[in-house]
């Protein structure tokens, strides 16, 4: 399958041109070359290499000339690296090859790496180490450049687009390195993964830059939550958050600041909403918030998806638990007026955070508060009928709540027929007939 990759439109670097040659094209004197993007046509997909010679006969070596397997593997690896190393340099430096001369086909590099690594994980590890050693100075230089360009700027709209462009350019280059190295994997990691780890290593050695980027990301997230974000913020955020994808073990790097920022934001916003809302409007606000945050998780906003369970706990804490007295009073009002949509919404919200037991507790309190008066007035059955209707329509026929309703009313002396009790009665009747 041919794969076409366009140069990054945001990159500030000048991309070399892609030139195809026929087999008769010889030296193609005066033409610039760049790394090809297809593996299927070795006559068209060529990469310039300084002082390249005719492709060495690395696939037709006489077995008798190399008797020792270890020496043969070393020879394969050395020849593969002779081809791969200059290719990596061209990719990372975005070099344009302007000197006339021979070209070395991409597929030749591809096959050489395959021959060197075939069936021997130790050889793959050596290739990985060589590539890491070749790439790390370039990545260190990239981080130093970002430090220099971003220092002294606290405005995310100024420095984050620059970081974004350089990150996209880095992703493009490391993807090409992985391509030309035959998509080698080691312990489940690709060369792209290795490149990203090196990026994080160098970024962690520049803590001021790292904190600056994370702070900028959090400010963009806040703007997006407030509806102030520009149209392109979503793509910008997703790519910037992906910079930290391989740092999943270092929760203090991005998770803790993200969750702290989220907690502070919703604590303040919930207070503002409560000042101008009744129970119905507040429940709608909480539902919109839950759905918006879950949507970001589903759309692979990395900070959100990697912190999903903790994020939902923060929302539960700041939007529900922190205002439990308000919600309990509101629940009583909703039950009194049988506001089905709001009761259904309230149950759904607490179910989303696995807190059905909270609904169970306030439902029990409601029945006990209303039941004594209903018994004295002789309207206990009417109260049960009303609550049972709400249970069917709003509470998903939750078994826990059903048991609570049954226990409370039976405590007031009202017999509550049900499927389970009716089945026992039917069994008892059969036993009496026998």
From Swiss-Prot:
* Chain positions covered by the region annotation Disordered: 1-34
Q: Which family does it belong to?
A: Belongs to the cullin family.
Q: What is the lineage of its organism?
A: Eukaryota, Viridiplantae, Streptophyta, Embryophyta, Tracheophyta
Q: Name one GO biological process term.
A: ubiquitin-dependent protein catabolic process
Quote the protein name from its UniProt record.
Cullin-like protein 5
InterPro entries per record: Cullin, Cullin_N, Cullin_repeat-like_dom_sf
- The superkingdom listed in its UniProt entry is Eukaryota
Task: Name a Pfam family for this protein.
Answer: Cullin
